[in-house]
Each structure stands twice: as C-alpha cells, then as structure tokens.
Amino acid sequence: MSDDTVTPMMAQYLEIKAQNPGAILFYRMGDFYEMFFDDAALAAEALDIALTKRGKHRGEDIAMCGVPIHAAEGYLLTLIRKGFRVAIAEQMEDPAEAKKRGSKSVVRREVVRLVTPGTLTEDTLLEARRHNYLCAFAEIRDEAALAWADISTGELSVTACPLPRLMPELARLAPRELLVADERELDWIEEVGCALTPLSRASFDSASAEKRLCALFGVGTLESFGNFTRAELSAMGALVDYLDLTQRGKLPLLRPPVRETVGGTVQIDAATRRNLEITQALAGGRDGSLLSAVDRTVTAPGARLLERRLSSPTRDLGLIHERLGAVRWLTEEPRLREEMRASLRRVPDMDRALSRLALDRAGPRDMAAIRAGLAQAQEIAQRMPAEAPALVTRALEALGGHEALVDLLDQALVAEPPLLARDGGFIAQGFDADLDETRRLRDEGRGVIASMQAGFIEVTGIQSLKIKHNNVLGYFIEVTSTHAEKMLSAPLSERFIHRQTTAGQVRFTTVELSELETRILNAGNRALDLEKMHFAALRTAILDLAGQIGRAARSLAELDLISAFADLAVTEDWTEPEIDDSRAFAIEAGRHPVVERALRRTGTPFVANHCDLSTGETPAVWLITGPNMAGKSTFLRQNALIALLAQAGSFVPARRAHIGLVSQIFSRVGASDDLARGRSTFMVEMVETAAILNQADDRALVILDEIGRGTATWDGLSIAWATLEHLHDRNRCRALFATHYHEMTALAGKLKGVENATVAVKEWEGDVIFLHEVRRGAADRSYGVQVARLAGLPASVIERARTVLDALESGERESGGRRQTLIDDLPLFRAAPPPPAPAAPKTSPVEERLREIQPDDLSPREALKLLYDLRALLT
C-alpha cells in the first residue's frame, strides 16, 4: 500500500472530523478513544500523555494519542477546563456486524455528543454546589435579551437585556459559555471568564425559535408561559438549537421558561459583586466570600439555590416576608429543624440525575438517587406538622404522591447499584424470575448440570451415568458400553438421543440438555440484556413522572435553604430584619459575617457598629472619616451585605435591622490598574464611579471609599466633593461615603441628610490603637504616619515624614502665601538624615593579644606556645 493510500478507517475518521472542525475528536477504537493529526498533538500536550504515530498520510506520519474509555471523563474535564470542545464518536455496531457487510468493512461510527463548557451533565465534570449555565444573547432591532439554561438541572430563564446590562447580568450568572450571533464582536467577554461560541444568524431566527420551543414543550403556543419579545424568543431558540446540535437530537429535560423582569431583583453590577466578594473572594475561589461564610446547606441543590438567592436578592416585599417567616418558624422549632436537616443530608442530587436520565446518559446510581430522594421527601412530608408557614406548606405538597415509584425502584434495584448499566448487577434478586434463573445458570452452571445428572440417573437407573463437556460435542450424557442396549431401547431411546459411540462409552443428549447448554452459554449476555430491558422500563417510568419529581427536588432545595438560614441565625445570633417599603436603613450592632468568622478563628472579638440612614424621604448620607486600618471599608461592606442578606430571605448579623426596600447596591471600594485595557487605577475608579452616578436611583444603597485618591490632592478633593453633592442632589439615595479629605466634613452643615461619622482611635505613648468603633462626628487627623510606622517603614523615613507633616500643618494655620513659602523652603529632595553611627564594637581578648604580637620576632617554639595561649583565650 502506498503512502498516499487512505485506509477505510482513516477515511471514516477524516469524514467525521470534517463535520466537527472546531472540536477535538474522540474516535472510539475498542476500549480507547483515539485522536489523530493536529488533534493528537493538541491533546497530548494538554493532557500530558504520550504522542505516538500510526501509519502515514500523504507521505507524513500520522500523529496519534489515546485515552482509555474507563478514564475518559477525567481527560474530558481537563480539556474542557483548558478551553477545548470535544466531539465523541462512538462505535454504533460491533465488529462482527460490520464483517457481515464484507471482510474490509469499517465499524460504523457516529458523533453522539459534542462536549462544551456549557453542556456538561456528568457529576465528575461539574461542581456539585454550583450551576453550570449556558447563555445566549440576542438582538433584534432595538430589542435585546439574554437567555440561560443549566441542562444538568433543567432550568431555563430569559430576561430583556440591553447591551449595557449584559456585563452585570453575566457577572450575576457566571456562565460557562455564551452563544452570540457570529457577526457580534464581544472582545470584552473575557472579563466574565466564559467561553464565547458564535452561531449563525439562522440559529437566532425568532420565527423558527418559536416553533422549536413549542415542539420542545409540546404546546401549540407559548402564551401560557408568558408574553415573550422577539429578542427573548430569539435567545431561547438559539439555546435550544445549540443543545440540539451538541446533544445530537437528545434534548435535555428543560422546564418551561421563566421570564425574569428587570425590576424583580436587586441590581448589582460586576464591580460591586467583586468588591463585596459575594460568591467569590478577591483572591479567587470560594473561601473568604459571603457565600462560604453563610452556607449551611446540606444538599447540592440547596447550595445552588443559596448562590442564586445571594446573586439575585428579590425586590418582592411579599416574597421576602414569606421567606423570613419560614426561617423564623424553623428557628422556633429546633427539634423539627434538626430532624429535617438530618433527612435532607440523605437527599441526593435528583435534578442532575433526572437530567442524565432524560439525555440517556444515566446509570443505575442515578435511579437509586431518585429512589433515595423521593423516599426522604416522603419522610419529611410525614414528619411536618399540619400548621406551617405558607412557603413550607407549598413545598410539602410537592413531596408526596411518589409511593408507587419508590416501591417499584425499591423492588427493582439493589441497595448499592454499580455506576454503569453495562456492568449489570443492579436489578434486585426476586424482581424477575427469568433473570434470576439466567443468573443462576451463569453463576451456578456446574450445580445445575449436577442436578440434571442426578435426575437422569434416577430415570435410567444407571449409577455410572455422567454429563460431560468437550469442545466438539459441547455437553453430552455418557454411559459405559455395557448400558448401551438399555439406552438405545424404548422407552429411554425416546428421550435420549444417540450422539457418538467410542471404544468403551456411548454418548447421548436430550432436548433438555441441549436447551440448558444454550442457556448456560448465553446466560451472561442474556442476563445483561434482561437488565438493560428493565433499565429502559424503569427509565421510562421515572421520566413519565419527571415533572412531579422535578417539583419535589426544587421543594427539597427550598426546605434545605430555609433550614440552613434558620441554623445560621440560631448558631450565629442573627436577627430577623424588618423590611418595608420605607426609606429606612437603621442597623444596630451590625457585623461583617466574613470578617467576624475570620476573627473568631484567632479568638479576636468583632466590634459591632450602628448605622442609621433613616431620614424619611430625603437623601441620607454618612460621610465617614478616620485613619486607614481603622475599619472604614469593613463598615461600608458589612452594611451592604446586611441589606443583601435581608432581601435574599436570611436573618442578618445585627441586634436589630430596619431596612427600606433596596433596588440597587453599588460599591466602589478599592481599585487596581487594568493594564490589559490601558486603564490606570484612577481611571478604573472614575469609570466605576461614573456608572454609579449615572445609574443609581432613589432606592439604591451606595458605598464609596476614597473617591479621588488616585490623583493630585486638590483634584481628588474636588471630584469627591462633587460626587457627594451629585449623590445627594440627583441620585437622592442612601449612601456611606468614606474619605480622607477632612475638608468635606463641612458638607454636613450645608446638605440636609448628610451626617459626619468617624472611626474612633486612641493614642497611647506615641502609638495609635484602633478601636474599630464608628461614632457620629468628624476625625481631626488621619494618623497616616502612625499607620506607616506600624507597617514597618524605616525609622528615618518615619522621622522625615513627621518633619514634613509638622511643617505642612503649621502652614495650614498661616495664610496661603505663607503656606506656599513653607512648602518651597522644605528640603524635599535632600537626602534623608544619615542614621546614627553604630557604636564601636568591643575588642575581644584574642584581638588585643594578636595586636601585641610581632611575628618576625617569634621562634618556632614561641609561635607554637602562642597558638595554645590564643586557643585558651577562646575558652
């Protein structure tokens, strides 16, 4: 065969690869997924596996690498996390079937799935406590919308989303993949950290989208789900089209779409989410975030629900009160709460198990998860009292009515089923008599043969009769030649069929033995086939009740979250907030949940603080001054987090909290350079501040820290001053404004609703002690030099700083001209005063003796004696 000849197998590979150009192709060959050409080079490097070669193509070696099927999911996860997409081509027949078409026929293969970051369903590829969202952004004329789905749980939602709102929404959802029309350029999408997938404009066609959605949900019109705009239909249609492409026609079990309104949740932009560390700490990861500090959930769906609530606190006052009422009820029922949480700990992730069953990607353990989850649901429902809050009552209604399915799964499945259906062994003994007999033949073939042999001995009366086996005859009955006449005569000859006569033995068979032989030889395959048949039937039985099971799973997640909030409130001494539609914001003894948790580990108490922005209908601003390290930023953040927790339905870390409904939370606390986009720290700060001033409404809660610090003093003061005036006059919102510009404290006497507050410090013998107490009033000093000293700056720098500070403060008390003269006279560029000369080191006795020695005057004997004398001085 020449190098240019393409083998049938390689021709098939190239054809499949051409149909999936943007993905690494996992090409099934026996027990391995093989990769070739460029795919092999990319995968070998990404997976750190050996790169080999297999034959030639057009004169060049064909690069090849492979991964075993049993370990494929781990390799898949690595590739997905590194940004690759993977097309999986499976063998659709066994080699024996292929050979029926000809000796050189290739086993038929098809891509059964395209694995992408937003379309994962396996537990090994997913984070159990986080959603895995796939988003689609669509624009039609002057309308735009964002749709998102988690195919591992069946959630589908959509909202109107003008382009300026896209970044905040993506920050809220944190999707793994975003679908856009191929002509749309979104270079900045990398900031969100998700994969960007362009689709053809046809995928976003709204007319086709409506038909696809109606077919998916089996309805004639979508009106019962809501009145969707063309852009919303377009976004949802693109999602469904992409899922059809990646799942190769096996669409996931999506629930009817939920249309979220823009005003339904508290608006929080990307910068604020980052600054408040709601679900992710600034250092990256979950540890150190609000989510990690408050998560007491005991189920994966409950944890995902908690993240959704913290990311999207509601503005529905009735819903807030309903959730808080349920939490209050469980705080007052400790025994019931603990029993519920004990049951919930045994609830598996039914949502994801159900999704895998719908995609025909499930194993027996997914069915066992449904069984265990529904059984615990029944137990919880039976334990709950008749009198319960409305939210709990509604949840309980969805937990019952699954007795028949639970009984079926109990009878059908073993207690601990294997991971994969192909391994068998998951159908319980006694569920199917035929399967039991087949397994008995497979596992106890010798015993069955011995039992049949005993029966034949009894019938024939020949004690030496044996049932034997060889590769030519298979199973046969053997007697000695002395019994041949008896066996060949009626009535035995009617049952026993002569097979062979040898030199001393005669061999027979019977219909029963032939059938038994066939059953034994096929028992293994037949047992697997029977189990697969039962698996398919059980899968159908579960999917027929998918809607009810999904509602039960969501209800269990709700109960988990309610009980988690109640447990948090009791153990952390949190209080129920009073939420109404006023403009109040009064917090007594508020605490920062994350900082308090960190301090507790070191045995340090957290200093609680009050905050009162309740001034009726007028704007309410606290202007906070005080030194760095005193706790201003912590105070700002803790009040924003208290508002967020309250509207998420949780009790809050305070002695008392009265909060008028908050529509938006904005935070500008800390900034850093954005080198990739050519923006300095000051520019980043100004962009974030501009977003706040342009968007905050009169129900917003705004926290601002050190506005204007990144530029010259007078420029910074001017910007901070004007920003505060704008918040007061135009935005008219509730705000906490921390600054080092003490000149701004004069605004408290000029603007109604602006009050001064300061963080208390104490000086003791030249040191500054931070009390971390926020009090009304203004700070008289910044204590910057003292903080610098605590940070470890050299003593010469601290002394020089004090000199310059004293001169500048003296100039403040003089006229402007005198002040400028003092600044001009300061030797600002003179070298720092030299450090004091070190004291002369004390001379040792050895050194003194050495100075007295004249080497040229010493004899050898004297030199040797001197060495001993010097050594004695050392001791």
Swiss-Prot record:
This protein is involved in the repair of mismatches in DNA. It is possible that it carries out the mismatch recognition step. This protein has a weak ATPase activity. CDD domains: ABC_MutS1. GO terms for cellular component: cytosol. Residues 830-855 are annotated as: Disordered. NCBIfam families: mutS1, PRK05399.1. PANTHER family: DNA MISMATCH REPAIR PROTEIN MSH1, MITOCHONDRIAL, DNA MISMATCH REPAIR PROTEIN MUTS FAMILY MEMBER. Belongs to the DNA mismatch repair MutS family. ATP binds at G626, P627, N628, M629, A630, G631, K632, S633. Pfam families: MutS_I (PF01624), MutS_II (PF05188), MutS_III (PF05192), MutS_IV (PF05190), MutS_V (PF00488). Residues 845-855 have a biased composition (Basic and acidic residues). GO terms for molecular function: ATP binding; ATP-dependent DNA damage sensor activity; damaged DNA binding; mismatched DNA binding. The keyword ATP-binding applies. Gene3D superfamilies: 1.10.1420.10, 6.10.140.430, DNA repair protein MutS, domain I (3.40.1170.10), MutS, connector domain (3.30.420.110), P-loop containing nucleotide triphosphate hydrolases (3.40.50.300). GO terms for biological process: mismatch repair. Signal peptide: none annotated. It comes from Cereibacter sphaeroides (strain ATCC 17023 / DSM 158 / JCM 6121 / CCUG 31486 / LMG 2827 / NBRC 12203 / NCIMB 8253 / ATH 2.4.1.) (Rhodobacter sphaeroides). This is DNA mismatch repair protein MutS. Keywords: ATP-binding, DNA damage, DNA repair, DNA-binding, Nucleotide-binding. InterPro entries: DNA_mismatch_repair_MutS, DNA_mismatch_repair_MutS-lik_N, DNA_mismatch_repair_MutS/MSH, DNA_mismatch_repair_MutS_C, DNA_mismatch_repair_MutS_clamp, DNA_mismatch_repair_MutS_core, DNA_mismatch_repair_MutS_N, DNA_mismatch_repair_MutS_sf. The gene is mutS.
